[in-house]
Regions:
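Short alpha-helix plus adjacent loop in nuclease-associated cores
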Residues: 96, 100-113
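Core-facing hydrophobic residues within beta-strands of well-ordered domains
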Residues: 70, 200-202, 391
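Short beta-strand-loop/turn "lid" adjacent to the catalytic site in phosphate-handling enzymes
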Residues: 43, 65-97, 123-128, 158-182, ...
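A short local loop/turn or secondary-structure capping micro-motif enriched for an aromatic residue
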Residues: 34-37, 101-103, 285-286
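A conserved helix-loop-beta module that forms one wall/lid of the active-site cleft
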Residues: 189-210
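Active-site core segments that coordinate phosphate-bearing ligands/cofactors
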Residues: 4-5, 17, 108-127, 132-166, ...
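Short, conserved phosphate/pyrophosphate- and ester-handling motifs at nucleotide-, phospho-/glycolipid
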Residues: 48, 100, 226
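N-terminal glycine/serine-rich phosphate-binding loop of ATP-dependent small-molecule kinases
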Residues: 1-94, 119, 146, 218-222, ...
Length: 441
């Protein structure tokens, strides 16, 4: 089959045309998602939903013009965030993104909303989760009066394409809102009631790949989460395979037939009744960018003019640092939790084991890469301890791995197996295309 996949990301919108039998990408297109709205509130991260839909439709239309043989359309995009829709299926407000910080504001007797939820319901949530955002809006009179329900931006795009008046949210996206029972595939309405929310606002949910309707006569399927889509695009449904993604953040994912969660590890709905076990490092590849900025700022102070980007030099430093790391009895160690963790948002990174001999640019550069990898490897060890998943393959995605061979080698050393870079650069869009062909009659 020839399928189209659309990925509505936070900063870009991508589309691909994929031959799902051969795996060949016939066409790809990526445009900037420049839809952020400046509200004047530094904690608020919202985007213009109408502008996103317009840009995404232009990308899709271009694919359809170039490839009229497309027989299905799959959707994915940024999870957690919500768009309110009215009874006619129209957006009534912006997209409140996963980056939104209202859930961390200390506005409830000196506590954040996530703390209130944890105390009242025993649930671990994060600011940016859809129901955390909705609860804050409800308590502050910010929910539009016309709002009937809410959904993700890719669900809303599916509604616009097909003319649906009510969203149908796949469990992979519904779970990202919070207050969701992953085992049973439904919202935890009893806990929703504890925080005085009306469950009538919750969207309809499905755990199957279903057809939403059609666009230009072509079936459009329910959107899936970008984490699941990226795994499907890069790995497929292979077991014993770990997907490592290193972009702005870092993420580790593996398929399991067994439900398992622990601190730092989340079980997310996948497809065909399976689970995607995953964990994330919040800083991820940004840790390396922070180090690059550090070196560049030094050069700016030492020289006149604007210094060039330092990544090529840092690769040389990292290579030398690796040799020193393996031969040094007490290597410098970097904890790259510069932005905290999901469980400990106030935690910060550190550099330890500094000596006269190892405090060098080479050791620091390699130490940051090693710290980035160790954050994800430590998360894998938690999965392995709970599920005994033996790793036979490593698949890597994201520019942090594609552009950094030393980081690839570090992961290979840690896991004791080779790492293969994903065949696709637009894994999520390819996964969305694949998902559109998984309809079961």
């Amino acid at each position: 089959m020839i399928a189209a996949g659309i990925d509505i990301g936070t900063t870009t919108i991508s589309g691909v045309v994929l031959n799902t039998e051969s795996g060949q990408v016939l066409m790809s297109r990526t445009v900037s998602n420049d839809s952020f709205i400046d509200t004047g509130n530094p904690w608020e991260r919202v985007q213009d939903a109408a502008k996103i839909v317009k840009q995404a439709r232009l990308v899709l239309d271009e694919l359809l013009v170039q490839h009229p043989e497309i027989s299905s359309i799959g959707l994915t995009g940024q999870m957690h965030g919500i768009v309110y829709v009215d009874q006619d299926g129209h957006a009534v407000g912006p997209l409140y993104t996963w980056q939104d910080g209202r859930g961390n504001l200390l506005e409830f007797d000196g506590h954040s909303l996530t703390e209130v939820i944890r105390t009242a319901c025993g649930l671990q949530t994060a600011s940016g989760y859809g129901l955390v955002t909705h609860l804050y809006n409800e308590r502050n009179g910010l929910v539009p009066t016309e709002a009937e329900t809410f959904c993700t931006i890719m669900d809303y795009f599916g509604m616009v394409l097909t003319g649906r008046k009510q969203p149908l949210v796949h469990t992979s996206n519904a779970a990202s809102f919070g207050f969701f029972d992953v085992k049973n595939g439904c919202f935890q309405e009893d806990k929703v009631a504890v925080v005085w929310l009306d469950s009538a606002v919750l969207p309809a949910v499905t755990d199957r790949m279903e057809i939403l309707g059609s666009y230009q006569g072509i079936p459009v399927t329910a959107a899936i989460g970008d984490n699941q889509a990226s795994f499907l695009g890069a790995v497929g449904d292979k077991e014993n395979t770990v997907l490592l993604n290193m972009g702005t953040g870092g993420q580790i994912s593996v398929i399991s037939t067994e439900y398992f969660e622990t601190s730092g590890i989340e079980a997310r709905p996948f497809l065909d009744g399976k689970y995607l076990l995953g964990g994330a490092s919040l800083c991820g590849g940004r840790a390396y960018a922070i180090l690059e900025k550090f070196f560049r700022e030094y050069l700016r102070a030492a020289e006149s003019g604007e210094p060039k980007v330092q990544y090529s030099i840092m690769e040389v430093l990292a290579r030398k640092g690796k040799a020193a790391f393996t031969s040094c009895g007490a290597p410098l160690a970097v904890d790259t939790a510069f932005s905290g963790t999901r469980e400990e948002p106030d935690r910060r990174g550190s550099i330890t084991g500094i000596s006269e001999e190892n405090f060098t640019p080479e050791a620091l550069t390699y130490g940051v890469l090693h710290g980035m990898a160790k954050e994800l490897y430590d998360l894998y060890r938690k999965i392995d301890a709970g599920c005994k998943i033996s790793v036979s393959h490593l698949i890597g995605s994201g520019n942090g791995l594609r552009k950094n061979p030393v980081l690839v080698e570090i992961f290979e050393d840690m896991f004791g197996t080779g790492l293969e870079l994903s065949s696709y650069e637009e894994e999520a869009a390819c996964g969305a295309a694949k998902s559109s062909c998984m309809i079961k009659i």
